[in-house]
Amino acid sequence: AASDVYKRQIQQAVIDGEKVSGVTIQQMGEGLDTGDMISKIVIPISPTETGGSLFGKLAQAGADLLIKTLPSIEQGTAEFEKQPEESPTPYAAMITKQMGLMDFRKSAEELERLVRGLNPWPSAYTFLNGKTLKVWKCKVSTEKTDAVPGTIFLADKEGIHTACGEGVLILTEVQLEGKKRMETEAFLRGYHIENGIVFTDHKE
């Protein structure tokens, strides 16, 4: 059972901004993911999809598809479709914790997808004043800034406004090392952020 867009990693489809994912029921083959396909279903990926929510959708869709497919296998009426020898479906790299490190030189849109794709595991993160800051939710802003990527140029009720290589990202739900996950408005009531502070890619 693999994604119809990426083989192996569900999160990657969200990270790369794909519009659909899916589940395939197939025979076991000699090689990795080479067996004939029996049935498949395509699942749309919503603009607010997270890796966790997509996993849940695919798990349910896969279970439903298997229940529908088993009778045809038992009765010998299932139709088998060979996979192309040169599969157009790319194998995604294994998801690691290191993939969650936010590189603010990237565009705000790319980083927003990274945050969604790695929620709930392994989570996107950056470093604020030498401490790990996990980012659980964020949104792309239409604001303009000439600040260096990674610079916090405003922290208010809306969130932590951060300059990116292209565009602005507003962090709306975060978790500082050793603290609970919380909406940014609540976080800022107990943690003062000076405008101009820059997120880093390492601890001090």
Residue ranges and their predicted role:
Residues 1-91, 96:
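Donor/substrate-binding cores of folate-linked one-carbon enzymes
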Residues 41, 98-100, 167-169:
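Short amphipathic alpha-helical segments
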Residues 44, 101, 177:
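Short, flexible active-site loop motifs that bind/organize anionic cofactors or intermediates
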Residues 93-106:
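Acyl-group handling in specialized metabolite and lipid biosynthesis
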Residues 104-204:
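An anion-binding loop in the catalytic cleft
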